[in-house]
């Protein structure tokens, strides 16, 4: 009789245990970018870091996306621990129903809250060694590859207009994925790429073809109305000094659906695992607490708690 009672108790405990474990596990959906992009790779790295840093208590499911606008729009229908990446400026545009969010304003956009910055979209103007180009004016008469439909292509086209090069360069009809071979065989003199640094295609171009990344002047950066960014010396082969360029900050956001404890855990784990992520992928090395300045809207209270604990500087709108 006693044995049967103990057996029943053990069965009861075993039945409850999986449910208890499931309750303690935090599940997060992380909406990223196209699966072929560096930002999708970053999302996978963050997912692994969260699992390792939380001893398995945080499980991140990475979802592919067609871009930042889609990520923001999905806030309307998503509930719970939905995390997504986007340039901070898109949150302000969404709230105001402007640009790509015209006639799409929704109260849910007011519930978006920032967690932490990730590597910025960094502009690279890459010129071949053979071209001899060392500044923007030298691009006149050259063949340049911008690509199509991407942020880098749109931004590159904008800069050509801003800096007086519209109609003065030949735009190559080559896919951006073929930029390095086209540069090496002389089909193009240069290409424009936007991505976190160090960018794989720029690494290859610099190492195998002696390509040079152009620096922008202070005036050019001001004209672009983008965020200034310095690519440290030695990032690319043959780069003896820092490169001044522009960037579009990117941040991981959640909504007020996420409780403070989860937001705190995600933020704390991200920063505590950043050094190990940097060892595996250099693009994390450029992320710092100073990049909180790029967040234009509210920070999640749970994330803010962590930033206050480490003495990070927060703005009044945070």
What are these regions (language model features)?
Residues 1-9:
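Bacterial N-terminal signal peptides that target proteins for export
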Residues 17-24:
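Sec/Tat signal peptide C-region and signal peptidase I cleavage site
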Residues 27-53, 58, 117-185, 289, ...:
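Bilobed "Venus flytrap"/periplasmic-binding protein-like clamshell domains
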Residues 82-119:
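Acidic, polar ligand-binding/catalytic clefts
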């Amino acid at each position: 009789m006693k044995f049967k009672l103990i057996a029943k108790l053990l069965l009861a405990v075993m039945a409850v245990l999986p449910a208890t474990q499931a309750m303690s596990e935090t599940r997060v959906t992380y909406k990223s970018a196209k699966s072929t992009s560096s930002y999708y790779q970053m999302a996978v790295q963050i997912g692994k870091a969260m699992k390792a840093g939380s001893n398995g208590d945080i499980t991140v499911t990475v979802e592919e996306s067609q871009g930042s606008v889609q990520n923001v729009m999905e806030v309307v229908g998503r509930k719970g621990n939905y995390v997504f990446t986007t340039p901070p400026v898109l949150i302000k545009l969404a709230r105001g129903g402007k640009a790509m969010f015209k006639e799409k304003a929704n109260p849910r956009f007011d519930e978006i809250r920032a967690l932490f910055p990730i590597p910025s979209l960094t502009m690279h103007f890459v010129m071949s060694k053979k071209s001899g180009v060392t500044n923007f004016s030298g691009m006149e008469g050259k063949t340049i590859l911008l690509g199509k439909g991407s942020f880098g292509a749109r931004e590159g086209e904008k800069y050509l207009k801003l800096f007086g090069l519209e109609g003065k360069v030949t735009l190559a009809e080559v896919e951006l994925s073929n930029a390095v071979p086209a540069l090496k065989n002389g089909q193009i003199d240069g290409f424009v790429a936007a991505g976190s640094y160090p960018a794989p295609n720029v690494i290859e171009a610099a190492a195998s073809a002696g390509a040079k990344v152009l620096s922008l002047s202070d005036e050019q950066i001001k004209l672009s109305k983008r965020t200034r960014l310095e690519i440290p010396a030695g990032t690319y082969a043959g780069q003896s000094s820092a490169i001044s360029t522009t960037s579009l900050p990117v941040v991981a956001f959640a909504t007020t659906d996420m409780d403070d404890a989860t937001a705190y855990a995600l933020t704390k784990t991200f920063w505590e695992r950043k050094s190990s992520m940097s060892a595996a992928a250099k693009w994390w090395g450029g992320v710092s607490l100073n990049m909180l300045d790029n967040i234009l809207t509210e920070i999640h209270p749970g994330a803010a708690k962590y930033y206050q604990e480490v003495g990070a500087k927060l703005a009044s709108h945070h």
